[in-house]
From Swiss-Prot:
Physiological role: Protein S12 is involved in the translation initiation step.
Pfam family, any one: Ribosom_S12_S23
Transit peptide, UniProt annotation: 1-63
One GO term (biological process): translation
Source taxonomy: Eukaryota, Viridiplantae, Streptophyta, Embryophyta, Tracheophyta
Statement: the UniProt record of this protein carries the keyword Transit peptide: yes
GO cellular component terms, A-Z: mitochondrion; small ribosomal subunit
The species this protein was found in: Oenothera elata subsp. hookeri
This protein's name: Small ribosomal subunit protein uS12m
């Protein structure tokens, strides 16, 4: 029996129009349909349960704060760590090595950067880079720390100064000796 003949038979029995019969056969009253539900999706719900779930999905938030939320809570400022603050407005600070380790740099570079976790005299803990080839630092060594980040190593924003305190300079270095605490070579 086709759908049209079936509805016409029902109309004869109940004396209703086609629209009122089809609306009464829906799973929900017409008031709920007119209040925001999508009618074609509801009609497809008989065949497809996934479509039925999509028909009753609640609207999701857009991700922006409403005016009431802004009035109640306001905007939070992002706090960035200030690397100058660790040295306390000083050009250098003395500190004690807590740990000496290596760290791999960001892409595309490849190495093992030597770093030391240092507790400064103002009780701030920082990661400091140990420049040059080879070093004699170990736990409880005293070092002098200056500012200056290492671009490849995330979180390393200080440098250890070579040739001062317990960190020895690099022996037999000819060029850039002042940066690595190397002594002037004996002229022969």
């Amino acid at each position: 029996m086709s759908g049209g003949r079936w509805i016409s038979n029902l109309r004869q029995v109940f004396g209703r129009s086609r629209a009122s019969i089809s609306s009464s056969l829906l799973p929900f009253p017409p008031t709920s349909i007119s209040s925001g539900f999508h009618v074609p999706r509801l009609l497809d719900a008989w065949k497809n349960p996934v479509a039925a779930a999509a028909a009753f999905r609640l609207p999701q938030s857009s991700g922006f704060a409403t005016m009431n939320q802004l009035i109640r809570h306001g905007r939070e400022e992002k706090h960035r760590s200030d690397r100058k603050r660790a040295l306390g407005k000083c050009p250098q600070k003395q500190g004690v090595c807590l740990r000496v380790s290596t760290r791999t740099p960001k892409k595309p570079n490849s190495a093992l950067g030597k770093i030391a976790k240092v507790r400064l005299s103002n009780r701030n803990d920082v990661f400091a880079y140990i420049p040059g080839e080879g070093h004699n630092l170990q736990e409880h060594s005293m070092v002098l720390v200056r500012g200056g980040r290492v671009k490849d190593l995330p979180g390393v924003k200080f440098h250890c100064i070579r040739g001062v305190k317990d960190l020895l300079g690099i022996p037999d270095r000819r060029r850039g000796r002042s940066k690595y605490g190397a002594e002037k070579p004996k002229s022969t």
